[in-house]
């Protein structure tokens, strides 16, 4: 709207001889350049957008898989004791959160490729922003829940009488720690996607 007003005002001044007509042409070129950014920069932005989504899929899939497959059986005082992720509701929520984020990120790859090849609009980025914001909140909630239980499992809580178990279940705890690392990495990727989508959606004209 500002560019259109600037051009109309320049035309008015040029009509009455206040502005030389050469400035009218320069103003039109400048406005067109600012409204239409270089194609190479836009393609680079969309390429980075797609790469971040692929990295998000990889990180969330790895986090969910490592958590689901984390189990270990040890013998304590002659008794077989097994540790599995399904024994903790926080770990199950963590697995579901990353699995959902992975599936939804795969689905958003199709519109992301569509933006790359068929052109993009601020409204499309606004819907991607809403999706990324929801997925970021979901992954962060899963990370927070699993981190709290993992901390108790590694260090225990003397005040509550909870003993640390990672001294006996070292392999199990290591897989959970790696799973958390991948999930936090996925959170960073989704955060970057949220910022990028929000920046593009600001161009919506109301």
From Swiss-Prot:
Keyword check for Membrane: yes
Keyword terms, alphabetized: Cell membrane, Membrane, Transmembrane, Transmembrane helix
Gene Ontology CC: plasma membrane
Cytoplasmic compartment spans: 1-43, 114-124, 199-206
Subcellular location: Cell membrane
InterPro entries documented for this protein: CASP/CASPL, CASP_dom, CASPL
Family recorded in the similarity comment: Belongs to the Casparian strip membrane proteins (CASP) family.
Subunit details: Homodimer and heterodimers.
Name of the molecule in the record: CASP-like protein 1F1
Organism: Vitis vinifera
